[in-house]
Amino acid sequence: MRYLVICITAVLAHMSLTIPYYAWAQTQPAGSAPSGYVLVEEDVIVTFANEPKKSFRTAVGDFLNRQMRAAAAEIRKGAAYLKLEAARASGDAKKVLIDSVQELEKLANDVQKAAVADLKELQNAFARAEYALARHHYLKAVELRAKGDGQKTGRELQAAADYVDSGQVWLTQKMHEGVSDVVNEARLVSAKMVYGSGAAADEVGRAFEGLGKELDKFGSTVGTLKK
């Protein structure tokens, strides 16, 4: 069973998660975390997959209200969650997440200094961050599907679908019309997998194929955004 060793800088309050800043992935038995750290199952982390998008949307509201310090704090929350996900990612997915973390941290600093005038800078950075998360969760789902773990596969597929969907909020142009149907199909299949209600192999395959194509289109659009 995989765990994340996490430095205790996180708190849960009012159903909102502040993500710890330092984390690294470990494969080890429970109880072996060093002093000042906790050992958290990866499954627990996935349950908070929606936190970055909440922070990003709150940051936009704060930015528009000229509450720059508050906006910067929300951007840092999102960046910290991406750093946490990067700790359990690998290969190119890890690099894309880390690149996004660095972009968000710089953006937060600039916002706090009132050095950002254009909302589009936030929107573009958030689109890249949500693409990085969507791709990461999708690749995790592919990995877990190959291992035959239906429930965990479903959770990761759900998170990937959510970020393919919510990431469109930040794009300067809408993705093509059929994306909602693909996302909804992936969500339906993922729910069946999570709750064990019997997702057929062919519908699982279609969900992965369809979402993978939408993810590629999302990535192509994000690649054209100005940094």
Regions found by a protein language model. Name each.
Residues 1-4:
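Positively charged n-region of N-terminal signal peptides that target proteins for export
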Residues 14-22:
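C-terminal segment of classical bacterial N-terminal signal peptides
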Residues 24-227:
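Long, charged/polar, soluble alpha-helical segments
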